[in-house]
Amino acid sequence: MEEIFKIGQIVNTHGIKGEVKVYPLTEDVNKFKKLKTVLIDGEHRNIQSVKFQKDRVILKIEGIDTMNDAETYKQKYIEIFRSNAPELEADTHYIVDLIGCMVYDADNMELGKIFDVISTPSNDVYWIKQPKELLIPVLKDIVLDIDIENKKIVVKPVRQWQDED
């Protein structure tokens, strides 16, 4: 399992005092409020303040004190250690842990590896690219078992839930 998570990407500067504008890579941006320290390029950095602006997070990070300083951090990722990540509710998983899991149907037919997880308003969707592109809705009646330790997910046979149109 990954021990370091990307939780955001610095996309721009904000103001003249070294704040950075962050595109969050997490559904719950309120998680940023709980952060005390993050990693940028493998270096520990203390968070001094967190604000929100539309769909972005504005961070003041210790050691980034001018707009010129902040400019050098554009496109860099903000990461945290798994041990600092918030605890998940039962039956939920970090996307980073799902990516790369092999998906099988209940008949033990291999469907492929999860390439990405797409978040939609109603439910997440597992995206498999190989050997054949397949989008699997993450619903309790379709996803039967998730075994993160063994990187294995079992779903109902596709013919039972996919439209043939």
Curated annotation (Swiss-Prot):
Keyword list, A-Z: Chaperone, Cytoplasm, Ribosome biogenesis, rRNA processing
Subcellular localization: Cytoplasm
Pfam families, A to Z: PRC_RimM, RimM
Keyword Cytoplasm: yes
Example of a GO biological process term: ribosomal small subunit biogenesis
One GO CC term on file: ribosome
NCBIfam families: 16S_RimM
Domain remark from Swiss-Prot or TrEMBL: The PRC barrel domain binds ribosomal protein uS19.
Subunit structure: Binds ribosomal protein uS19.
Family: Belongs to the RimM family.
Name of the molecule in the record: Ribosome maturation factor RimM
Native species: Clostridium botulinum (strain Alaska E43 / Type E3)
Source taxonomy: Bacteria, Bacillati, Bacillota, Clostridia, Eubacteriales
